[in-house]
């Protein structure tokens, strides 16, 4: 097990072992993911484009500031801005069959796709979710496609909570469905997945 860290600026590195790295100030990670060196790391851009990279390819460094830019270790480009980073086992069969990835955009579009549809490590980027013009991806989460609830929260303090099974799984190139109606000046700023009681 190792830790994969990514800064706000997009510097990425991995630790040599499973000791959680200590960071502070400019060296603090925006994303910190625990993974096996055999896992696949997914970098997801705000545009909905994504890249899959074998964890062992990510450069090892003592400090995140010594890492490499995400677009140097993946097929994403320097024009991409990261929205999420997550890890999956290289053998997706190790996950429950119904495991899904849930994406949410700032305009409230929500989509669920089976992780079995995600490609493995490749030199090509792929579309995780179709993001409409002017919109951007804000959240990516994993769920079991069964007993969870989804909470969306907006900048103006509105919220909606609904059952996960209200959203059916769709293919990777789909844009998704409208998760909530928004006021013209409002936008979704957060999405969480909760277990039901």
Task: List PLM regions with ranges.
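Short, structured "edge-of-domain" segments at secondary-structure transitions
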Residues: 1-197
């Amino acid at each position: 097990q190792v830790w994969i860290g990514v800064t706000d600026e997009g510097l990425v590195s991995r630790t040599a072992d499973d000791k959680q790295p200590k960071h502070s100030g400019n060296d603090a990670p925006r994303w910190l993911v625990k993974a096996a060196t055999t896992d696949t790391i997914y970098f997801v851009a705000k545009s909905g484009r994504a890249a899959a990279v074998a964890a062992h390819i990510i450069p090892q460094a003592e400090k995140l500031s010594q890492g490499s830019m995400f677009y140097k270790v993946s097929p994403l480009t320097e024009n991409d801005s990261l929205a999420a980073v997550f890890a999956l086992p290289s053998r997706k069969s190790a996950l429950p069959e119904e495991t899904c990835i849930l994406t949410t955009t700032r305009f409230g579009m929500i989509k669920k796709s089976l992780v079995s549809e995600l490609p493995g490590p490749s030199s090509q980027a792929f579309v995780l979710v179709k993001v409409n013009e002017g919109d951007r991806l804000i959240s990516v989460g994993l769920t079991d496609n069964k007993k969870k609830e989804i909470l969306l929260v907006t900048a103006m303090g509105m919220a909606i909570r609904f059952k996960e099974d209200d959203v059916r799984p769709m293919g990777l190139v789909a844009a998704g469905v409208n998760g909530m109606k928004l006021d013209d000046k409002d936008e979704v700023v957060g999405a969480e997945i909760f277990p039901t009681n």
